[in-house]
C-alpha cells in the first residue's frame, strides 16, 4: 500500500489545541470492525462497552518536561528536546539551532543559564548530552523543562498542560509525548469501570519524539520505525492469560499499549514460546495485513493523515472501515489529535 492511501483532508479548525474542561467530556466514536457500524457518543460511553471479565491495559508512562531552551557558549540560541534518558546524567536529544554543535562543545540551558551540558557525541540526527551538575536529568527537567506539546498544537505550553498532558495513572517518567487515549480517563470513570468487574493492567512504553516524524517513503513497506522502550512485566502476562482463559477481552488504551502488547506477542512467536515478559526496545510497525495476537478492542484518538498510527488502526478495524470512520469524524466535526476526541473500536475478525 502507498502512504497516500492514508491521506484525508482535515480542516485546521478540527485540530484540538486545548483539552476539554473535563477529561471525560470528549466525544467517542464507537466502531464495530466487522460491520463498520458507527455510533456517536461521549467518552463515558466506554462504560457501556467494557464488560465484566475484560482486561483494560493502560500505558503508565509519565511525560517528562522534555523541552529546554538555551544557548551555545558562543551565544547562539538553541532548543533541546529529549528523545530518551540514557542514565541519571545523560540524554539523547534533538537539538535545534542555526549550526549543529560539535562533540566536545558546551551548551547552556535554562532561562537564567542554570545548567550546562557537554555534547559527547552525535548519533545521526540525535545528540548525546551529559550534564555538568550534581542533580539528575529528571531533577533538572522538572526545574527548567517545558512540557513537550506536539508541533500541531502550535502554541507555547502553559501551566495547565503539566496536568492535562498527563494521564491520571502515570507512574514511570520517560515519555516525551503523552499516550493520549489515556487522557480521557479520570479517577471516577476508572472506579466505575472496575465496579463493572473489569480488571486493569499496566504496561510501559516511553513515547519518543519520533512519534511525530512524518513517513518519508511512498510505499509503507519501506518505512522503518523509530525505537521506543517497552516493559510488559510478568503480572501483565499473567493477567492476559487469565483473561483469555475466562473468555474475557483485552482492551488496549491507546496505540502505545497495543504496540507494547503486540511486541511481547511477536517476541514470543519468534522464540516459539508462550507469552513471556518483554523488556527492551521495540520497532514494531503495524499496518494492514498484520495479524493481531492479543488485542480485541482499542481505545484511541484520531490520528494524523498518512501517519503510522492511522495505519495501525486500519490493520485493526479494516482499511475501508477506518477511512470511512475518519470521513464521518471530519463531517461531524470531531476534534483531532492529542487533545481531541476518541474512538472505541472492536477488532475486525472476519
Swiss-Prot record:
Q: Which GO terms describe its cellular component?
A: cytoplasm
Record-linked InterPro entries? QueA (IPR003699), QueA_dom1 (IPR042118), QueA_dom2 (IPR042119), QueA_sf (IPR036100)
Q: Which organism is it from?
A: Vibrio parahaemolyticus serotype O3:K6 (strain RIMD 2210633)
Q: What is this protein called?
A: S-adenosylmethionine:tRNA ribosyltransferase-isomerase
Q: What function does this protein fulfil?
A: Transfers and isomerizes the ribose moiety from AdoMet to the 7-aminomethyl group of 7-deazaguanine (preQ1-tRNA) to give epoxyqueuosine (oQ-tRNA).
Which keywords describe this protein according to UniProt?
A: Cytoplasm, Queuosine biosynthesis, S-adenosyl-L-methionine, Transferase
Does the entry feature the keyword Cytoplasm, yes or no?
A: yes
Reaction equation(s) it catalyzes:
7-aminomethyl-7-carbaguanosine(34) in tRNA + S-adenosyl-L-methionine = epoxyqueuosine(34) in tRNA + adenine + L-methionine + 2 H(+)
Describe its partners and assembly state: Monomer.
What family is it from? Answer: Belongs to the QueA family.
Amino acid at each position: 500500500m502507498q502512504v497516500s492511501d492514508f491521506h484525508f483532508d482535515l480542516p485546521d479548525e478540527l485540530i484540538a489545541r486545548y483539552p476539554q474542561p473535563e477529561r471525560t467530556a470528549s466525544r467517542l466514536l464507537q466502531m464495530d470492525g466487522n460491520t463498520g457500524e458507527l455510533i456517536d457518543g461521549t467518552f463515558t460511553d466506554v462504560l457501556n462497552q467494557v464488560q465484566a471479565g475484560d482486561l483494560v491495559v493502560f500505558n503508565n508512562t509519565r511525560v517528562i518536561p522534555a523541552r529546554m531552551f538555551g544557548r551555545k557558549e558562543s551565544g547562539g540560541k538553541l532548543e533541546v528536546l529529549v528523545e530518551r534518558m540514557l542514565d541519571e546524567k545523560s540524554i539523547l536529544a534533538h537539538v535545534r539551532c542555526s549550526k549543529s554543535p560539535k562533540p566536545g562543545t558546551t551548551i547552556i540551558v535554562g532561562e537564567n543559564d542554570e545548567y550546562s551540558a557537554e555534547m559527547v557525541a552525535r548519533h545521526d540526527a540525535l545528540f548525546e548530552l551529559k550534564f555538568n551538575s550534581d542533580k539528575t536529568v529528571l531533577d533538572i527537567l522538572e526545574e527548567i523543562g517545558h512540557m513537550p506539546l506536539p508541533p500541531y498544537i502550535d502554541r507555547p505550553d502553559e501551566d495547565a498542560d503539566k496536568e492535562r498532558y498527563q494521564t491520571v495513572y502515570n507512574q514511570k517518567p520517560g515519555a516525551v509525548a503523552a499516550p493520549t487515549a489515556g487522557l480521557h480517563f479520570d479517577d471516577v470513570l476508572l472506579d466505575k469501570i472496575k465496579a463493572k468487574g473489569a480488571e486493569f493492567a499496566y504496561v510501559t512504553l516511553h513515547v519518543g519524539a519520533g512519534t511525530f516524524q512524518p513517513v518519508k517513503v511512498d510505499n509503507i513497506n519501506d518505512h522503518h520505525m523509530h525505537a521506543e522502550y517497552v516493559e510488559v512485566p510478568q503480572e501483565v502476562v499473567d493477567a492476559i492469560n487469565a483473561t483469555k482463559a475466562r473468555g474475557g477481552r483485552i482492551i488496549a488504551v491507546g496505540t502505545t499499549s497495543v504496540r507494547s502488547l503486540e511486541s511481547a506477542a511477536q517476541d514470543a512467536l519468534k522464540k516459539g514460546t508462550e507469552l513471556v515478559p518483554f523488556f527492551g526496545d521495540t520497532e514494531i510497525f503495524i499496518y494492514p495485513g498484520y495479524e493481531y495476537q492479543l488485542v480485541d478492542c482499542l481505545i484511541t484518538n484520531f490520528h494524523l493523515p498518512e501517519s503510522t498510527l492511522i495505519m495501525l488502526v486500519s490493520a485493526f478495524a479494516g482499511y475501508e472501515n477506518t477511512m470511512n470512520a475518519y470521513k464521518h469524524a471530519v463531517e461531524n466535526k470531531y476534534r483531532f489529535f492529542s487533545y481531541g476526541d476518541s474512538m472505541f473500536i472492536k477488532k475486525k475478525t472476519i
